[in-house]
From Swiss-Prot:
Residues 1-24 form a transit peptide. This is Altered inheritance of mitochondria protein 23, mitochondrial. Residues 104-132 are annotated as: Disordered. One of its GO terms (cellular component) is mitochondrion. The keyword Mitochondrion applies. InterPro entries: AIM23 (IPR029427). Residues 117-129 have a biased composition (Basic and acidic residues). Keywords: Mitochondrion, Transit peptide. It is found in: Mitochondrion. Coiled coil: none annotated. Residues 107-116 have a biased composition (Basic residues). Its main location: mitochondrion. Belongs to the AIM23 family.
Length: 437
């Protein structure tokens, strides 16, 4: 018994239809009335047994000659049997699929060709134009405040020069060079040095950049921030800001005003040589300009009160030989003429002692006024003398210079002692003269 499944039977029926000459076309009933005898049905030829080679040989024997051509021409069979076996491989006979493959291959070749040309164009552009080098500011040294000050300077330079090109004063040879700000900043040691910008006088010119100390750059930056903040507060109407501005203006006026050092005619010589001498030396060491004002208590009070107007006092008191009407009240007013002579001599001794102190301090001074009323001495620090040449330094050794200084000091001390003895003798003679009277 041979068992035939449903699928196998359907395949057999299709093959039977294709093998019959009467059924060249499906559902074609024109040839049914023909009297041609049908060929005997051979079931064994349709069965596939054994190996694949035997099956294929039987298939080829079953469908040979004109019957094979009939299978290919039957469009109903071709709908279900799209492949024919050639060995162990399946070959598609669909012409549409082959055309689609050819179209895809042409499209891919065109796309690849376009990509290649675009890449060649990019390579050509790269070789034609070299890429621009990105310039960046590298600020790694220094404190945060110093870095902020430097960033503020960079922004100021950018406002004037968009390309960051500046005129730079080279600190090594003090020559003016045109340089890029990035090179200057990247070579700068912000822990020690800073930068300072001078705005150009004309619009087209480049800004001038110099090196300075870091603390100077930070100070300039902080003052700018403070002034900017003050303006903002004043615009808002802050009372505290207005008060701070007034106090600052007063302090600036006091600094700009020349200092006045007051002396009374009744000062003793010991106080003059100790207290006042130390104060004069301290002011000279600071390099301050000041005025020595000698007079009575009334005039001293008016001098202290008019500190801001000492310029007018200087002009009024310079080159005054006669006593004014206002100064007549300050003249020595005593009944005994001998007391007047004694007071005048005492005042002369105070002025001589003061001159010796100023000469010892090596300061420049100018005396004006009248001894009967008041005297003003304008003092200024000594002018810096030029350093001696190297040849003179070699000739005068350090030991010889020290000896010379010591001798000069001794001479000055001896002169002072002699003056003091003379002053004391004069005072003693005056006092003895009074006692005898």
């Amino acid at each position: 018994m041979i068992r035939i499944t449903r699928s196998y039977a359907s395949n057999l029926g299709l093959r039977l239809l294709s093998s019959n000459s009467k059924w060249n076309k499906p559902f074609d009933f024109t040839n049914l009335n023909s009297n041609k005898s049908a060929e005997p049905f051979d079931l064994e030829s349709l069965l596939v047994r054994g190996t694949s080679g035997e099956g294929t040989s039987k298939k080829s024997s079953a469908f040979s000659g004109p019957e094979k051509n009939a299978i290919h021409n039957n469009r109903f069979v071709n709908m279900f049997d799209k492949t024919t076996q050639t060995g162990n491989k399946h070959v598609h006979n669909n012409d549409g699929s082959e055309k689609f493959k050819e179209f895809n291959q042409k499209h891919n070749n065109k796309k690849h060709r376009n990509q290649r040309s675009h890449g060649d164009r990019r390579n050509h552009m790269d070789t034609k134009k070299s890429p621009r080098k990105a310039l960046r500011f590298q600020i790694s040294t220094g404190s945060d405040q110093a870095q902020n000050a430097l960033k503020d300077l960079i922004s100021k330079v950018h406002m004037v020069s968009k390309s960051y090109k500046v005129k730079f004063v080279n600190p090594q040879n003090n020559k003016l060079e045109q340089k890029h700000l990035v090179e200057i900043v990247n070579d700068l040691d912000l822990a020690e040095n800073g930068l300072f910008m001078v705005a150009p006088s004309k619009e087209g010119d480049l800004p001038l950049v110099k090196t300075n100390k870091v603390f100077e750059m930070i100070k300039h930056y902080t003052t700018e921030l403070a002034t900017q903040r003050e303006k903002e507060l004043l615009e808002k109407g802050s009372i505290a800001a207005q008060k701070a501005i007034r106090q600052r203006d007063r302090a600036e006026k006091k600094k700009s005003a020349t200092k006045i050092l007051t002396l009374s005619w009744k000062i003793s010589l010991s106080d003059l040589n100790n207290q006042k001498k130390m104060e004069i030396k301290r002011r000279m060491n600071k390099g301050e300009k000041f005025i020595l004002y000698i007079g009575d208590k009334r005039s001293l009070y008016s001098a202290r009160k008019s500190v801001d107007k000492e310029g007018g006092i200087v002009e009024n008191m310079k080159d005054t030989t006669a006593v004014n009407e206002e100064e007549s009240e300050e003249v020595v007013n005593v009944n005994d003429p001998s007391d007047v002579d004694f007071e005048i001599k005492r005042r002369h001794m105070i002025i001589e002692e003061l001159q010796s102190i100023l000469e010892e301090c090596e300061c420049q001074f100018d005396i004006s006024g009248h001894i009967d009323s008041r005297i003003m001495v304008s003092c200024a620090p000594p002018i810096a003398t030029t350093k001696p040449n190297e040849g003179n330094l070699e000739e005068n050794s350090s030991k010889e210079l020290k000896k010379q200084k010591k001798l000069m000091k001794l001479k000055k001390l001896e002169e002072k002692k002699q003056k003091k003895t003379k002053v004391e003798e004069d005072l003693d003679s005056l006092y003895s003269f009074k006692i005898e009277d």
